[in-house]
Each structure stands twice: as C-alpha cells, then as structure tokens.
Amino acid sequence: MPRTHAIEDYRNFGIMAHIDAGKTTTTERILYYTGKSHKIGEVHEGAATMDWMEQEQERGITITSAATTCFWRDKRLNIIDTPGHVDFTIEVERSLRVLDGAVCVLDGNQGVEPQTETVWRQADKYDVPRVVFVNKMDKIGADFFKCVADIIDRVAGKPVCLQLPIGSENNFRGVIDLIKMKAIVWSGEALGANFSEEAIPADLAEQAAEYRTKLIEACVEMDDDAMTAYLDGVEPDEDTMRRLVRTAVQRRAFHPVLCGSAFKNKGVQPLLDAVVDYLPSPADRGEIKGIDYKTEEEVVRRPSDAEPFSMLAFKIMDDPHVGTITFCRIYSGKVESGANLLNSTRDKRERVGRMLLMHANNREDIKEAYAGDIVALAGLKDTRTGDTLCDPTKAVILEKMEFPEPVIEIAVEPKSKADQEKLGIALSKLAAEDPSFRVSTDPESGQTILKGMGELHLDIKVDILKRTYKVEANIGQPQVAYREKLTRRTEIDYTHKKQTGGTGQFARVKLVVEPNEPGAGYAFESKIVGGAVPKEYVPGVEKGLNSVLTAGILAGFPVVDIKVELIDGAYHEVDSSALAFEIASRAALREALQKGGSVLLEPVMKVEVVTPEDYTGSVIGDLNSRRGQIQGQDMRGNANVINAMVPLANMFGYVNQLRSFTQGRANFTMQFDHYEEVPRGEAEKVVAKYA
C-alpha cells in the first residue's frame, strides 16, 4: 500500500505532564474529536482508551506509553501518551527520544509541578519543541497567568500566550485567539459541543491588545523582513503570524501557551490546530546521526523513503493475543512485513512478522511502513529497548538511550513449583519490557531479587506478576545491598588435620590477605615455589576462598576489594586432596577476615530535593535525621535545590514522608553514588538483623 500522507504531513508528538494534570483526559478528547474514539473514556471511571492495563485503570495513572494514530485537517498525528509519576520517568525518557514535538499539559490550579520540571528537563535534553496547554481552567483556583509565570520561574521556559481565558473557574466559557483577535466560545460542556467565533468581550479588549503586542514582538524576532515591516508600522497578517510561531517553536525560541478544559470539552480543537500549525514534522526535524556499523564513522540518515532503512525500538510490551510487541520509530527508508533486518546493536538478524498500527490497545495490520511512522512489530526475538534495526546492506547504529541504575530491591518467593515456572517466564518478559527493572538470584538464599527505581515501580511489577501472570508469591521487605571489606593486611598459617580410621585429611596453607584498591574487586595469586602445594590442589584453595568471599563473616554479604596470596603450605602424599585444601583455605580466610578487622559497607545515595523555600528547614532537618550529609544548596527559579549524600537504608518510604510534610510540593531524585563504611552502632543493628 503506497504512502497515504507525505512526511511533511506527519506530527509525531507526546503529551507530557505531572501526574493528575489531565494528560490522559486531553488525549481521550483528541481521539474523540479526530474521530478515532466514539465513546469517550473518563479516567475517574477507569475507562480511558489509552490506559489499558488493569493497574492503570484502578490507580487512575498512566504507566506505559500507549501509541496511537489519528487524523486532523488531513495531517496524520501519531500520539504517545506518557506517564507522569516519578518512578516511571524511564517511560517518558524513551518516548521523548523518538518524538518530534510535545504538548506539555499543566494543571491550571497547580501550575508547574515537580514532575513537570523533570519531564521538561528531559525534553530539553532531547531538544523537543513544545507547546503548552493550561488545562482545568474550570477548576476552583485556576490561574492562567500564574501558570505562565511558573514556566519562566520553575523551568526557565519562554512562554508566549496565543490565547487568553474568557472567565475562570465555573464561569470559564472560552478563549481569546490572539492571532485572529476573536473570542472562541463553547455553547455547552457536552461532548462535541459547538463553538462560535465572536467579538472579544469589551472588558477583556485592553488585556487582549496588550498580549497581542507581546505575541507580535516575539514573532517578528524570527524574521528580518517581518521585523522591518513592523518597525514601519505594518503588523504581520494571520498567515505570517502562524508561520513565525512555527519557526519559533522549531528553533525553541519560545513556547506558545494555550488554555482550556479537556474534561469540559473546551479548547481541544484549537489545541489540535496548534499541533498541526506549530509542531514539526519529521522532515522539519531533519537528519539523525548514527555510527556506521562497519567503519564506526559518523553517518546521517535523512527522513526520506529513498534513504537506507533505519528505525529505533523504543518500547517492548507483552500482548496476550499477539505475543511480544516492539514499538519502533522509523527514521529513514521503508519496510515491508516479512522483511529481514539487522539488529545492529546486538549483531542479530530479525524478521518482521506482523506489522501493526496501534490505537491504544486496538490494532490494525499493515503491510508497509515508511519514514516518520511509529509502528508496532510482532515476532522480533532478540530486540530490546534502545536497539537499532536497519537494512543489513547499509547498517547503522543510531544513538542509544541511557537508562538509570535501580536503587531498591525486594525478594520474591513463589509459593509452589508451578508458580516458580510461571515466575521465571513472567520476569524475563517484564525485564525485556522495562530496562530500569532488573532481576537477579541471591547466591546464598537462592531467592529471586527484583530491583527497580522506587517503591511504586516495584509495587506495580508485583501487581502485574499476580494479576497478569497469576503468580502466587511471598514478597519480602525492601532490602539494602550491603558489602563487607577487610581493613588491614594480615598473614595466616593454617593446618587442617583430620584422622579417622583409613585415609585422613591433611592440608596446610599460608595466606597473605590485604585490602585491594576501592573498586578493584578480588584478586588471587599463588606464589608457591618448589611444590609446597602441588598445582592440582590450588583450584581447591580457590574454591574454599570463593565460598567465604560470597557470604563474608559478619552478616552474609559478599566481601569486596580484597587481595589473597598463597605463599606457602604443606601436603601429605596419602592424606592430602583438593577437598582438604578447600577446607583449609576456607578456615584460613575466615580467620584472616576476623583478624584483619572486617567492616560493613553500605550504598550511599546522591539525593537532590527540590522544595519551595518554606519547607527548606524541614527538609534539611529530616535529611540530617536520616544520617544524611548536606553537600550544598542553590536556587532554581523560586525553588530551593538541596543536594545531600544519604545511606540508602534510611531512604525507604522517603517519597511518602517528603510528600506529606511538604504537601506534595517537593520532589526528589536519587541515584547510587558510592559504598561507605557503616558506623559501628548501625553495623551492630545490621549484623543482629541478618546474621
């Protein structure tokens, strides 16, 4: 099937915001007005089209980014709905990587909220042009102008109003279009309510004139001819204004601001017009850089069907009907179902089975896809998030995505053997879908350990295990990954002798054990000369050492950064064996760790708290009570940014406590920084708990 829309007529955009700003409702209205969805889904009824996982519908939050295609004014819109919760920023990050533009939705009452800041910074990182939609203008306390000021103060944005609200709270009835200089008024709140263009109300005429002047002045900055004409007293006409706003958005010179109430069906159609008029097409975004698979030199791929094929996998989902679905953004060339592609990131061949166009969780089979398309592929075996798929004859590796390290872990124990099997399958699927979620096995207890970005992140994963995969399991409390370390050099001479009737056991080892450089890990060297310990027994020595190093001597945690030298020993012709040397070295190392002053190490997190100034004292006091060390603070807009180093053990439950004592106005990020010795009093508690 040939291309139905020119690449210039595509708009690949995401809807991003803080949790509860009305992002999913806005998307639902867009789908309704573009004719894709004939029954509107309300989030608070748990029926939104884009929120199709049970966990999302219950919690009223969006967890996975669903992709959907719709049409407006003969343009093809590919929308990615993204989550707004801090534990799911990975979803936002990977959506932004493949978008050309974004609509940032603000809650008219709350303005720029913590997660808005995070998402805005991520959009800056990927240079994503955006327009702002101030939603919930019908809410008590909604303040359009405070929201505009927030964009300047809190995210250093450059807002320029394209609309002003008419009325507020319960009396919100429409908007003033500053380009047309007309009032757009909706006749009711019902779905598909009609709107009419009217003269601007007299009481708002002066304000409208003032903001139109600001808009014109921002626009003419984009074009020398328009600036010259304006200085000569000629204002740009409507078409010129739209062209100049479009230029400004593409250059990220300013951020156009619109307003409305998605829930009350006001302001959605003008928002769709703004997406079409101002957000870039793939052609506007231009070429993408990559690395040539063979020569490793930089190459470019232009957004054209004639270029060699390349696309990026940005999300993997498990679908009960189709199996694994891989969401991909095509940057260049075209692809047909059945095509053989190269996964250049992993050097694996992949065959495209079914190719699907997604609408939330409905799907439509397609045979061909082109540059600019966002498609879902079924049947890929080895592809993971962030991988490049391309034409094997012109292979390229596109820029990879960066994923943060998990900071929290819980143990999971299946209740039966059948659950054990289901758990294995489910976890491998979940880990493939989400790169910030890791799975490992504890070598001592054999328990399965889940690692993630935060408590809600792991809660949702456990919920999916229980509901979607029907795994019955016991879930442990969140745990800290402690380590043990030797503090001083020590020498041990140990003899293992056991005589029972028949063959006995005999082995003597002399070890020098000392701390290694931080991060250097474990090193073993045999310095035996003259056969004091025969070569065939040295692996037995190493096996004994390893068994102690994996579990330490204090509380069952691995020993890190240690050097062991075998410098002497003795054996017996009849009674010595590899097993005897294993037992001797195990006992020798345990003794060395005791004599050498083993200590516990704990992970220390780099924590950044962004808080309104009123709460700074409370935040610092609370961090100090968690054994935190304040590293410094500075202002960001009107918020205070506090940097601290805090042991992970003291950060469990922090997100909820921070929210409660700052009324949800502070937010924080944390990532692993280094391991540090646990103070003696704390270490005694840890040993008592785990030993």
From Swiss-Prot:
One of its GO terms (cellular component) is cytoplasm. GTP binds at residues 17-24, 81-85, 135-138. InterPro entries: EF-G-like_DII, EFG_II, EFG_III, EFG_III/V, EFG_IV, EFG_V, EFG_V-like, G_TR_CS. Keywords: Cytoplasm, Elongation factor, GTP-binding, Nucleotide-binding, Protein biosynthesis. GO terms for biological process: ribosome disassembly. One of its GO terms (molecular function) is translation elongation factor activity. Belongs to the TRAFAC class translation factor GTPase superfamily. Classic translation factor GTPase family. EF-G/EF-2 subfamily. This is Elongation factor G. It comes from Methylobacterium sp. (strain 4-46). The gene is fusA.
